[in-house]
Amino acid sequence: MNREILVHVDLDGQPVFCGRLWTRSAPRESASFEYDVAWRTSRRGFALDPELPLAAGPFHTGRPIFRAFTDPAPDRWGQMLLRRAERALARREGRNPRTLTAVDFLTLVDDETRLGALRFRDAAANGGPFLSTGGTRVPPLMALSKLLAATTRIIADEETDEDLALVLAPGTSLGGARPKASVKDSDGNLLVAKFPTASDEWPATRWEATALELARRAGIHVPVFRLALAARKPVLLLRRFDRDGEARVPFMSAMTALSADDNQMHSYLDIVDALRREGAQAAKDLGELWRRLVFNVLVSNTDDHLRNHGFLHDGIGWRLAPAYDLNPMPTDVRPRVHALAIDDTDPTASMDTVWEVAPRFGLATKEARQIAHEVAAVVRAWRSAGKKCGLKPKELDRMESAFEHRDLAQAAK
């Protein structure tokens, strides 16, 4: 089936028409996009994707959809929810479930909670509501226990239709594989709630909170976060950094910025190049990125792939988004080898390699070593930070190999 989608970008709280997206499902999924002339010639207009430069089109791709539209689409958790919902609907209607396409995943996501500032309308609806609008609204914090219970049943493949209805709208818009949902606090701020699961080998939400606390102390920009208990289990709450009050902030993952695919090896130096090319304050953000590189090596946050780095558009250009998805990893589960190479080719955690690439970040040796020393001094207090986040002595011991290693001692010198 062919579809035409009207693409809007929210700027200062108002949707601005940006262009048209055409998708085709046969003989295989593909897409085309063309900017609206007004957007392309406006001072406020910007390219959604390096593969979609701000120029006359149309542009075509043999991929199911352009990378710019994969960022606001669901990842594994959200896709699983949408497939479950389609199965339930097909069962009620007495038919086989249909295969959801890339544009289905994109447009079935709840509009209120969709990542970033892109919004979509169906051209055939002649200016109808944004996709997808309606249904269950974003639940309040007081619904955490219900959301946790529903996600637990969904993971066990024992959910009811009511469970899907509760989780579908707030849960489909967020990336990653961990169960999560959007909720609102008493001030109306949009939050991400990350839930623990029965299969967690350690208290994952408490450890992520610990890593965020260490990063914050180390001078790294992180979202506002806290732990809350739901049914006596720790839920990690993070304020959405792609929202400024009610206004949406454009977001682009490093995966999109580099026109990359999951099966390709990339490096921190590729992100450096992207910041130099597209950044509104490249020098400042390169210093921040260097600090994050040191931190990731010292806490063994090895799952630092390109989807776990992102950029926010500030009206002038792209800025490094706050750090997110920070998760220490013990060496008996995974060696200290990062998803991204530190230099051009080597992903092995090593402060020796980190020192070597410092000039690529625009840092003199003295400044680079001072930053590393500051980060190391904070990371050395990982046990006290973990205790503050509710981790027990045995749980702290379980993660010791992620923190106590030669690189920490070397960075602290």
Q: Residue spans of the language-model regions?
A:
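Phosphate/dinucleotide-binding and metal-coordinating scaffold of catalytic cores
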Residues: 1-306, 310-413
